[in-house]
Amino acid sequence: MSVQWTDEQQRAIDARGGHILVSAAAGSGKTAVLVERLTQRVINQEDPLTADRILVATFTNAAAKEMKTRVIEAIEAKIKVAPDDLYLKKQRQMMNRAQITTIHSFCLSILRENYYRIGLDPAFRIAEEAELLLLQDDVLEEVFESFYASADPAFYELIDSYTSDRDDQAMLTLISNLYRFSRSLPDPEAFYDHLIAQYDQPIDPDESSLLTRLFELEWERVGPVINRYMELSYRLRQSGYDEMADLLVQDVTPVRRINPEQDRWTTVALAFQAVEFGRWKGIRGDEEMKKFQTERTRLVSDLKKMRDLFVEKDGVDYLEDLRSQLGHVEMIVTLVRSFSAAYLEAKQQRGIVDFSDLEHFALAILEENGEPTDVARLLQERFIEVLVDEYQDTNEVQERILRLVSKSDEATGNLFMVGDVKQSIYKFRHAEPGLFLNKFKRFQQTEVGTRIDLTKNFRSRLEVLDGTNHIFRQVMDEAVGEIDYDEAAYLRLGNLGYVDSTQVDPELLLVDQTDTNKEELEAQVIATRIIEMVNDENPYLVFDAKQKRFRKCEYRDIVILVRSRGKRVQALVDVFEQYELPVYADTTGGYFQATEIQIMMSLLKTIDNPLQDIPFASVLRSPIFGLTDRDLGRIRAKSKDGSFYEAAILVAKEQTPLGLRVDEALNQLHHWRTEARGKSLASLIRSLFDQTGYFEYVGCLNGGRSRQANLNALYERAHQYEASGYRGLYRFLRLIHRLVERGEDFSEARSLGEDEDVVRIMTIHQSKGLEFPVTIVSQLGKQFNKQDQIQAIQLHKTYGIALDAIDPVKRLRSGTLLKEVIRREMDREMKAEEMRVLYVAMTRAKEKLILVGAIKGLEDQLIKWQDQPLDELLLPEMDRRNAKTYADWVVPAVLRNFLLSEDGPRWSFRIIALDEIAPYQELTKMVEQLEHVRVLEKIDHAGDETLNIQIEAAFAYQYPYQVATDTAAKQTVTELKRTEQLERAAFESTHRQSTYYRTPQFLGPTLTGAERGTVLHLAMQLYESGRSFEEQILDWEQAERISSLEAQTMREAIPELTTFLASDTGQLFEQRLLAGEVYRELPFTYKIDSARFRSDWHGPSDQAVMQGIVDCLIRDGDTYILLDYKSDQVFETTDNQNQAEVLRTRYATQLNLYQEALEAILHIRISRKLIYAFALHEVIEIY
């Protein structure tokens, strides 16, 4: 069945003559239209055009391949209908030569054919990123060394002004960043000249283009404030507060006289200097007046900040400060030019180019002195049509190249551009949406070009489209989003195949952040909503277009979109695992954070230099050597001042189990250091895998294949590093450090495939071009990233480089005029980009759109968000400009949904209470995460080791709550139990002394009673059902999970251990262990009133945080049994029954507290509390 194209789509397919811009909204079938246009051009025999005379430029190899494949398939389908058509067969063959390619590949083809024109070695290759990073570092260091050697005063003054006392890394980074930034522009040399010119402004405020621009940018903020002032004044007058209304008018009268079209800086500054704020005369008890006063206070604060810009510093001072930094900028330009030339020479010597070179070398071949070369003119003749996909993502260099190979006259040209400026989200790659916007506005006048708008969306339900339109028509316009979201931009329903449903309204879910971890709380809200959608009782129904019916929502239908990677994605993954929800985190990155990579990197760092404490200790603690935290503490205790390596050497000299193990580790490290000097890096890494057995070890862990893939990737990266001509472990480690420093990463291998029934997590950027039945947009409460705006040195393509003004005598720095301009420009551009990112995220949804945010101080924020005027469609410009999060745009727009129109777009809005968040699906997963439990109510000083308030004798009174000063805010259960026992002991006046003495250490290694108890606990923790203790102890010892001394202690205690297993409780333990219903060594944190464990507490109600570790929890039907192991002796009596009673009394408090904490945290019921006393070989029940 043939495709039924809309009128706009057909126009885009058929349009000829002149440059054509197709503005294709999300889901409008852009790719299908482009493929159809291509297909029609090559199969049309009335207007013959061979496939090799079309250039199609894309941004990814995948897009180019898909487009070429689809055109070929379309031609082959025509051939099946007309098998004897020679023209079609010829076109099919010509498709192999068609230039459907990425811009970089097209540039590469120009270089391969014309390398001799620019003196390029024909054997050049495209270098790996790692090789380029190392080369850049080497060249930069050489350039800086040469300047240090030259003793140039200007260079030394620059270094002294803008680097720290420790090193010059800040300036090295600046030169590197400035170089990369300049390469996104067609003429880097002209840009360097522009940098200098910006600091050479005339000292005349009214003639300075920078001061004029600063005023324009500030007026964008002042204008809306004045409007809010006048609107508030009007409401005051309507309410009968004429005097206060006049006061507001008086506040802004001087600035209302400013004519932003004509007035210059001096006039504007005088107007702001005349601003004075009169005294507000409130009326006691008048609540309406209080609200007006609060609004006015906020407006006064905003206007004062704006006034300060014009009053605190004179225009002449701004310009003189700028001029004072001219010498510094000239030196920076000298440095970057020196680096650029040296780096180019170094690449030529190695016969390599980078992707930036591909574009600039192609540009040099195509253009000379601003005019097209013979090569460019030949290409203009060759290509009858030049099509550009995703035009909104081009940069200025790429735009220049495309213009040079196409016909230049816009009215008669042959450039066909497709894209959507509302989806331009690659500014970090120097994409320039202004190129699209410029044509978007000009091409409305058809004589200079043709603009075709594709507004029908064939992806989404009407509810999704209406919900998206409802938000963006209120927040996006040219002032804030760089484009008006008007009728022409509205998403319109194109897919009429959806069947009506009552479940499809878009949702906004907000939760109050309180003091809970924001990422984890938000993840729990999302997990709870997904559980609701996929449950069997009342599932969300997805419409199956192929079967024309609804079906139950599956995990694979759902995507969660995040703004950025890192801990936020990990929080989602962790919570989903706790809820036992299948999840696939489709993220590039996390490789260097993977445990197995961190351990191997620590090992390589230690081999390179064992004096690095953290890597060395990490390796000792890792499974490679298997030392414990206690072992590391003993090593550090040997030498508190020296390095950890030096302390280890001292321990290795001791004839103790620890000394022997440390000695063995040091010998092994020495062997590997020797090996490193004689082997290639890749061979060394492979040898480490083999010798340590670590490769096989990680293969046995969860996700073993992925972990092994990560290790193999490290080996391959080392191999590539050496293939680039570099050698040495130190340089490899420096390369990895640079990659991490720049935020670059490798892809972490994943064991779960994309096609499986899992919830997907991906960044919004990764989702671009994709679609999903259910789209959950998270992180609405995440603050926008303003790092670029707070850097000490800032870069901007129009305004250059912003430096602080430095007073060399006073050693003071202050902001400059350029910094004020660039910071404001960057903020405008960032807000527009973030608005486009949000648009991309929301338009991924086919059937269900859910927005989620954890908001700090939600109640106060809601009061602010709902206080919006209803007389205009757009939200106030000032509020939109001041937005710090997506929620600042989305929530006010959604709230107005309930006020503007009864029949408007349907948004479901819910505030999620903490008790609505679903409990974890299985106790197992909850238990594994108990260490992450957070008390939701804030407890001051809960993290202190002790909370002792020292009362000096000088105070003349007795502090009434002295007991509180002796009580730690964080108590272990053992400490609580000990407190009770001490009080009871004091009451009974009982004094006992053990007749058992510890064997002196010089008589041989032995364990204290407490250490022996720890070993027995460890045995019960490691025990696996179905095998004897003898076998398992041998395995643990051979695997170095326990020391030989610990193994000996366990063997001696086998009778005590097996007696427990033979008991009724032990048999239940074995049964439940096989069923996976025994939970061991469970850490927890719980809040408790201090008075509960201090009988002499007479202070105010106060709380402490209790910490403990539960030895064992056994599921028994619908309840649980709490089991604790005790190895201590009872000396008060020799009668077993009496001894049991002593232990029961001794530990009743502890187990009662355990029960209370676990029942509160896990929402379970504990039916029995038991002690197994190893010394008595007896199970004792606590009542």
UniProtKB/Swiss-Prot annotation:
The family database entries (Pfam families) matched by this protein are listed as: PDDEXK_1, UvrD-helicase, UvrD_C
According to its UniProt entry, one GO biological process term is: double-strand break repair via homologous recombination
* Residue ranges of domain UvrD-like helicase ATP-binding in the record: 3-461
Which PROSITE patterns does the record match to this protein? UVRD_HELICASE_ATP_BIND, UVRD_HELICASE_CTER
One Gene Ontology CC term in the entry: DNA helicase complex
Known InterPro entries for this protein?
AddA, DNA_helicase_UvrD-like_C, DNA_helicase_UvrD/REP, P-loop_NTPase, PDDEXK-like_dom_sf, PDDEXK_AddAB-type, Restrct_endonuc-II-like, UvrD-like_ATP-bd
Kindly give the CDD domains that the UniProt entry links to this protein. DEXQc_UvrD
Positions bound to ATP: A24, A25, A26, G27, S28, G29, K30, T31
Q: Where is the UvrD-like helicase C-terminal domain?
A: 473-769
Under which EC number(s) is this enzyme classified? 3.1.-.-, 5.6.2.4
Top-level taxon of the source organism: Bacteria
Catalytic activity field: Couples ATP hydrolysis with the unwinding of duplex DNA by translocating in the 3'-5' direction; ATP + H2O = ADP + phosphate + H(+)
What cofactors are annotated for this protein? Mg(2+)
Under Gene Ontology molecular function, one entry of this record is: double-stranded DNA binding
Question: What keywords is this UniProt entry annotated with?
Answer: ATP-binding, DNA damage, DNA repair, DNA-binding, Exonuclease, Helicase, Hydrolase, Isomerase, Nuclease, Nucleotide-binding
NCBIfam families documented for this protein: addA_Gpos (TIGR02785)
Entries under HAMAP family matching the protein: AddA
Q: Which PANTHER family match?
A: ATP-DEPENDENT HELICASE_NUCLEASE SUBUNIT A, UVRD / RECB / PCRA DNA HELICASE FAMILY MEMBER
Quaternary structure annotation from Swiss-Prot or TrEMBL: Heterodimer of AddA and AddB/RexB.
Homology family = Belongs to the helicase family. AddA subfamily.
Q: What does this protein do?
A: The heterodimer acts as both an ATP-dependent DNA helicase and an ATP-dependent, dual-direction single-stranded exonuclease. Recognizes the chi site generating a DNA molecule suitable for the initiation of homologous recombination. The AddA nuclease domain is required for chi fragment generation; this subunit has the helicase and 3' -> 5' nuclease activities.
What protein am I looking at?
A: ATP-dependent helicase/nuclease subunit A
Taxonomic lineage = Bacteria, Bacillati, Bacillota, Bacilli, Bacillales
- Name the encoding gene, please: addA
